[in-house]
Amino acid sequence: MWKVFQEARLICGLVRANTVTGVPAVTRLFSSTSAGGDGGEPFLAYEKDPGPAFMREDVQQLLKSLTRLELDKVFRKRSVKDNTVEYRFMTDDQLRQELVQSINRAQQMLQMPPVVQAQQDSCRIVSKDGALKALSTAKFVFTDITYGLKNNQRSIVVRHPDGTLQEAPYEMRKRLNQIYFPLNGRSIHTSPMFQDPYLQQLLESGRYEFVLDRACVQYEPYEQEYHQLTARVYQHVNESRAFDALRSTRHFGPFVFFLAWHRLVDDLLLDILKKDYLRNGVELIVLLSTLHGNELQLDAEMKALILEPEMPALFETQEKSIEQLEQDQQFLAVIERYVNAHGTKKVQLNLAIQAYRELANEKLELARGIKRMHGES
């Protein structure tokens, strides 16, 4: 059975390799408008369109690797109607096939919501007909309900009492599209869970994934409310250092992208050091370098190693080999150079680096001693 698991790990690497798909520095923008529109904590917004940077193949590869695919978490029990567990007896070949299918399903479930620029509402005036002025005191809305059109392609216009014919504002378009062509799970009116005090209660209880999943259903990625809500959730996760709540979920990639875009990665880097995810730490630095220019120069061999697809963490981690421990020392040196040059929490990070280096040196000496005892060269 263990042989099957070892072969499955190789299969995982092949699947990962076959399915992997310069932005200048920006200014932090603050607003006092909350997702519910009632005012609240300030949030960070994207000054420029983040879409081109987010969609880059190398950025997507880095974000997927940072997400860390873990089958136990992806396929954990959820609060749904049908949550039964099925047990089957399988041969070794059937188990290999099932593992490959599970990895493919997990990668589909971890597909990241896109990060795009917030849409600006522009209501173009189609015409002004003075002859219709004072014909009625009410507004008339005309909607093209032709079957097969996308919601953003549908013509919706408003006739005002003064005779002006104008394109409908986005909120009205969204409401009418939901009335004529309802999307499952989306409501016409904003749910109270996106407003205080309910939103704050959900954040304090750590229901980050639940809030973000509901936000993906209720809003489009280009809506201003979606940007405000996700920014607030991301900031709360970062301040609470609850990174494991989003790790190995479809929201971890956009979350890391948000932190890297706004240069708020020190707490995440500290968490990566504590959890011995050094490769992810270097990937985070490479992501920063990609978004903000050459933050840190990496040699070609190191960069090629980082951009090489990594095997998903499907099973419990075993003791690292000597080669892996030596590679971790190289990763740690890269992280230390970044911390000394660009870190904002240098004291905490340097202490974590020092503690990790001492422990890693002990493990490396122990591994080399065991190898010498076994007479291996």
Locations of the language-model features?
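A basic, Ser/Thr-enriched alpha-helical scaffold prevalent
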Residues: 1-377
